[in-house]
Design a protein with these regions (language model features):
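Bacterial Sec signal peptide processing site at the extreme N-terminus
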Residues: 18-43, 267
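Structural marker of alpha-solenoid helical repeat scaffolds
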Residues: 43, 77, 111, 145-147, ...
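Helix-start (N-cap) detector for alpha-helical repeat units in TPR-like alpha-solenoids
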Residues: 41, 48, 82-83, 116-117, ...
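Register position in tetratricopeptide repeats
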Residues: 60, 94-95, 128-129, 145, ...
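Alpha-helical segment of the N-proximal tetratricopeptide repeat
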Residues: 43-77, 94
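Canonical tetratricopeptide repeat
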Residues: 53, 87, 121, 155-157, ...
Length: 267
């Protein structure tokens, strides 16, 4: 397993699920929209929102086709809800339909051009497509929205994206901003540790990965293996061996345990 990918996949699901739930719970976020009250909801809109909530639940369970079907029914009830198109974009992206996903995000932004949640998700979609410049643009637009409550997760997603692009200095800066906003966010700590490890800053990487591994229900084979490699590179082979044995005992069938057995600390 290469260093380049070591910490990234663990945070992706965390970031995406958070974006999805925030984007569907209360409608679009951002400036320039009229404040919505209960009287603004027609029967069709209320039915559509129920469908969207169901779709979000199915999506977080990995039932993407069922989620998409619920979104389609929401759009029958009300074809002008931006959060429905936002969620449809996520579902199509998860189903490997990038053109349909792109169309859905575009439609969502036509209806709510400054919705921070859609801008975040569209930025993350572009990152997955390795369309780095577009990802940067949409993340920046999301962060510009004055009432946006998801700045930490957008900084996290931006940091992950920049790390995938190989821009480690910028990735560290984005992840550090995310950490300042949400110091308890372990997805941020994991990815910051990974970036610092790749940059050779082992002492700081050790600080962040310990925050993750000190939480037993969060630590996994990936986090333990990163910690072991950090210790090995930091000149602490005994610490690396101790973490490797913990990895082998807890996750004996993992790729990371196999890499430890082969002494592949530098791969």
């Amino acid at each position: 397993m290469s260093d380049r990918r070591s910490g990234l996949s663990w945070a992706v699901a965390v970031s995406l699920a958070a974006a999805l739930l925030a984007g569907c719970a209360g409608g679009p976020q951002g400036a320039g929209r009229e404040y919505q009250t209960a009287s603004d909801d027609t029967d069709g809109t209320r039915r559509a929102r129920v469908r969207i909530e169901l779709a979000a639940a199915y999506f977080t369970q990995g039932q993407y086709t069922t989620a998409l079907d619920e979104v389609k029914q929401a759009l029958v009830a009300n074809p002008n809800l931006p959060e429905a198109y936002n969620l449809r974009g996520l579902a199509y992206a998860a189903l490997g339909e990038p053109m349909l996903a792109d169309d859905s995000f575009r439609r969502a932004l036509q209806l709510a051009p400054r919705d921070a949640d859609t801008l975040h998700n569209y930025g993350w979609f572009h990152c997955q497509q390795r369309r780095w410049a577009e990802a940067k643009t949409h993340f920046a637009q999301a962060l510009e929205q004055p009432r946006y409550r998801g700045a930490a997760r957008t900084q996290l997603a931006q940091g992950v994206c920049l790390a995938q692009e190989g821009r480690l200095d910028d990735a560290e800066a984005a992840l550090q901003r995310a950490f300042e906003l949400e110091p308890a966010n372990l997805a941020v700590a994991m990815n910051l540790a990974d970036v610092l490890y790749r940059r050779g800053d082992y002492e700081r990487a050790r600080f962040y990965i310990r925050r993750v591994n000190n939480t037993p229900d969060v630590s996994n084979a990936q986090t333990l293996w990163l910690a072991a490699r950090i210790e090995q590179r930091a000149g602490n082979p005994q610490g690396a061996a101790d973490l490797g044995r913990q990895l082998r005992n807890r996750f004996p069938q993992s790729r990371e345990a196999a890499a430890f057995e082969r002494n592949q600390f530098n791969e």
